[in-house]
Curated annotation (Swiss-Prot):
Keywords: ATP-binding, Ligase, Magnesium, Metal-binding, Nucleotide-binding, Tricarboxylic acid cycle. This is Succinate--CoA ligase [ADP-forming] subunit beta. It comes from Francisella tularensis subsp. tularensis (strain SCHU S4 / Schu 4). The lineage of its organism: Bacteria, Pseudomonadati, Pseudomonadota, Gammaproteobacteria, Thiotrichales. Residues 9-245 form the ATP-grasp domain. Heterotetramer of two alpha and two beta subunits.
């Protein structure tokens, strides 16, 4: 689950980090009042969406008066912001953040952390190249990114943070401020179950103060039951409508841009299914994992989700029966095809628990389903069914 910038800053501030002060505004009048309330000569109005690249997309503007703040807010709120991280429709802007002007600054740094699944540790990343896309830095100048793996048994140690500060070229009071920032960020990461966080840029002001000018936090959705207050911050308007609907039925769904709908049980098998569709010249329209314990109701909802996509011209169902029985899946497929009125070709590959019984149920159904003997055969048939 993602947080908005203003929510991320509030959370980080509660852990002792110095952040760029700001006020969230849900309409132009509130934006104008926020400018006056901040009391500076300048302010920055930022669209609050769950996507990066806001500045290049026109979602971040410097304003010099309350009237300008009102006008910028009016141009953003109620519209969709399209960035390089969104789809063509963009993300809806329901609010803007009006933040204090912290510039000029002497330096812009980058600080982030992620759960590194290969090392099974929280890994911090820091760089002198703040204020730009860190992905570009990683690609073009990987040597400029410092990495620190945190031993989960002892946590982040002050000496590790100091070492990073030295390598970033900080000095004097800046070092202590940075250590406090990094230790506070780690404490927030662990206590709030972050999956990822970024401060980009982490600015060094002319007076030596270190301030979080931006904040991005992604929470581990599997741990949200432990954090009802954080769960209350969820903004469903920023989530893909289909993916949101899928999560309500315990389906893992990600929309793609192809025309072959996929229904698979198991994330690994789903990835392999998409790969082999590509290998045979097709393009998957989605990633859809119905789970190891798929029920008849879940399969029906999965069909509805797939067919909600107008680009889908064929469907490949790939089920490996383990916990789930193939005969139950076959019955669910038949019921779903009848209920949803499927008009596109449907290729079905069943293997494992009661696969033969499931295949017979499908064959006796009278429906125009295309059976497949293996994964390669299924991919070949679904691609050829497109004509």
């Amino acid at each position: 689950m993602n947080l908005h910038e203003y929510q991320a800053k509030d959370l980080l501030e509660s852990y002792g980090l110095k952040v760029q002060k700001g006020i969230v505004a849900h309409n132009p009048n509130e934006a104008a009042q926020a400018f006056d309330q901040l009391g500076g000569k300048f302010a920055v109005v930022k669209a609050q969406v769950h996507a990066g690249g806001r500045g290049k997309a026109g979602g971040v503007k410097v304003v010099k008066s309350s009237q300008e703040a009102r006008e910028v807010a009016e141009s953003l709120i109620g519209k969709n912001l399209v960035t390089f991280q969104t789809d063509a429709e963009g993300q809806p802007v329901n609010s803007v953040g009006v933040f204090e002007d912290v510039y000029p600054v002497t330096r812009e740094l980058y600080l982030g952390a992620v759960v590194d699944r290969s090392s099974r540790k929280v890994t911090f990343m820091a760089s002198t190249e703040g204020g730009v896309d860190i992905e570009e830095v990683a690609h073009n100048s990987p040597e400029k990114i410092l990495k620190v793996e945190v031993d989960p048994l002892v946590g982040l140690q002050p000496f590790q943070a100091r070492e990073v500060a030295f390598k970033l070229g900080l000095e004097g009071k800046q070092i202590n401020d940075f250590v406090k920032t990094m230790l506070g960020a780690y404490k927030a990461f662990i206590e709030c179950d972050f999956a990822l966080f970024e401060i980009n840029p982490l600015a060094v002001r002319e007076n030596g103060e270190i301030v979080c000018v931006d904040g991005k936090i992604n929470l581990d959705s599997n741990a949200l039951y432990r954090h009802p207050k954080l769960l209350a911050l969820r903004d469903k308007s920023q989530e893909n409508a289909k993916e949101l609907k899928a999560s309500e039925h315990e389906l893992n769904y990600v929309a793609l841009e192809g025309n072959i709908g996929c229904m698979v049980n198991g994330a690994g098998l789903a990835m392999a299914t998409m790969d082999i569709i590509q290998l045979y010249g097709g393009k998957p329209a989605n990633f859809l994992d119905v789970g190891g314990g798929a029920t008849k109701e879940r399969v029906i909802e999965a069909f509805k989700l797939i067919l909600d996509d107008e680009n889908v011209k064929a469907i490949l169902i790939n089920i490996f029966g383990g916990i789930v029985r193939c005969d139950m899946i076959a019955e669910a497929i038949i019921e779903a095809v009848k209920e949803v009125n499927v008009t596109v070709p449907v290729v079905v590959r069943l293997e494992g628990n009661n696969a033969e019984k499931g295949a017979k149920i499908l064959a006796d159904s009278g429906l125009k389903l295309i059976p497949a003997d293996g994964l390669a055969d299924a991919a070949d048939k679904v691609v050829k069914s497109l004509g």
